[in-house]
């Protein structure tokens, strides 16, 4: 199953990101976009971030991004991948919207790894310089968290694995 998840994530991410619009009327915007794609954050290109997002999405049915606004809050300055297993949803508001997320390096030991709150991504409220975009596959009755599309066949995969071990 690991090979299936890895190869599917690679197919989701694709080979690279390219700008297909050849219209050079707004060359400055195109150069700015290409620079952002080449360096989405201090260490990675946007495609490298996308590969991590694709892996989380296929493995866990969800992904999380840390969106960093520019100092004047007019545009997105950086995008970082956040390991979705480190993210927990805050209590939803009266409309069912999650106002933010808690992040911890290790949820089994929150005394040493104190969770910290980060507001949810919102283009209308840019007061926080960092915001978390958390998204996944829609599933009925799953309001805050998501499940992977392969979960329904997990028991069959386990049975196949046990049968192959039995016949050794």
PLM features: residue spans?
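Structured, contiguous alpha/beta core segments that scaffold functional sites
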Residues: 1-168
């Amino acid at each position: 199953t690991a090979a299936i998840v890895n190869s599917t994530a690679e197919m989701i991410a694709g080979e690279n990101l390219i700008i297909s619009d050849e219209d050079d009327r707004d060359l400055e915007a195109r150069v700015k976009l290409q620079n952002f794609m080449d360096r989405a954050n201090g260490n990675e290109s946007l495609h490298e971030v996308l590969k991590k997002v694709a892996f989380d999405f296929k493995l866990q049915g969800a992904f999380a991004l840390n969106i960093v606004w520019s100092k004047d809050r007019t545009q997105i300055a950086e995008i970082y991948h956040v390991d979705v297993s480190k993210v927990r949803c805050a209590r939803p508001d009266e409309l069912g919207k999650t106002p933010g997320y808690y992040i911890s390096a290790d949820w089994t030991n929150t005394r040493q790894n104190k969770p910290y709150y980060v507001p949810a991504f919102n283009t209308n409220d840019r007061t926080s310089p960092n915001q978390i975009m958390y998204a996944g596959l829609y599933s009925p009755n799953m309001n805050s968290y998501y499940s992977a599309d392969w979960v329904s066949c997990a028991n069959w995969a386990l049975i196949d694995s046990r049968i192959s071990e039995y016949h050794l």
